[in-house]
Each structure stands twice: as structure tokens, then as C-alpha cells.
């Protein structure tokens, strides 16, 4: 994980070069993920939510981490969310969390979802999961990869109906 610390430290170095763009924030999507929902992430780097390690990353970045993805079904996630909810956006993602687990994480302060529908259980009529928990939380913002490949266009349209445009962040 020393490599991750070095990567975050490089954000500070890059910003000191006046010829480079200003970094307004960093999105830390990993390593606090559910290995069963890792997607393209390398499993050997995945770890449980770790308060001290995140502090090291945040310090190395000069406080530039603005969003961190956490799988709420992982051991230590609840304490992690409670610790950092006022400092960064806690985003739920790469998770096998069920509805109750996701809803509890949202009650604790995680009010964002990383790429809705991808790397999580689908919305089911008996197992509604993260998707329904996010829809039920009026404070929750959701990201969608709107490229027509990751999510079917009909699902994109229905998600706008379910959440409203003010709660959706389109990402690539």
C-alpha cells in the first residue's frame, strides 16, 4: 500500500508545478471494497476499511481526497463512515451489501453511490439492495455510467424517473 501513499503524495507534487492544472479533488475508489464485487480492481490491493490508512492517504494528498468508496458490508465500514462522514463524501460501491446494510450505512452518513448498478447486486423484488436503499434516502446522490454500454438506455431513463435529475451524477 506504500504505492497508494506515493500516488496520493504525487498530487501535491504535481500541483506545485505551475504549468500543471489545479487539482480540485481526488476520488478514492478503492481499496475498501468487497472482493466479491471488485470489478477491475486488483484483489491483492483490496482491504477492509482502515481509518489510520485513510488518514495516511489523506495526509499524503494534502487533504485532496474528497470522495472515498466503501463497501458497507465489510468489517470496519460502519466505524469508518462515522469517523469520516463530515470530512469527505462517503460513497457506497463495489459491494454485496443488502438493503438493510446499505440503509444503515446511509443513516450513518454515506450519502453517495459509486456507479449505480455496476459492481453491486441487482435491484430485486425480494432483495432490493443498494439501489432501493439509495432511492429511499432523499440525501443520496448516485453516479451512473451513461455510455449506453454499462447500463441499458431504458434503465438510465427509469433511473432518472426514480431519482430525479438533481440526484444523479453522470460519469465516464
Question: What are these language model-derived features?
Answer:
Residues 1-128:
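Histidine/acidic-residue-rich, glycine-tolerant segments that coordinate divalent metal ions
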Residues 101-172:
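Active-site-adjacent C-terminal substructures of enzyme catalytic domains
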